[in-house]
């Protein structure tokens, strides 16, 4: 009788653990504390990103590491493209991205960083949807 009671709980617990592992492996769930991506992503929104995202393109919104922080920005230029900023022209290295916040007046992004490029290795996901505001 005890064996039967244990097996009743074993399957749901195992399925829950497998489901949580798969969700954690595929999806990123995050919180956006700043207004740097407004109006696209409101300050205080929860977002869902995909860890496996395929080829990234100009216009994609990505989650990446920069100076020890996870940030969310839009790709403005990909490797091989040039970016004009003021009187300067920057060539984005292959395998890197130039990123901007949608709220240009309230975004610390590639325009202000010492190294303005985000290497592909620092990207952890691509935004698939905004969950809640």
Language-model-detected regions and their locations in the chain:
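Extended hydrophobic leader/signal-anchor segments used for secretion and membrane insertion
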Residues: 1-133
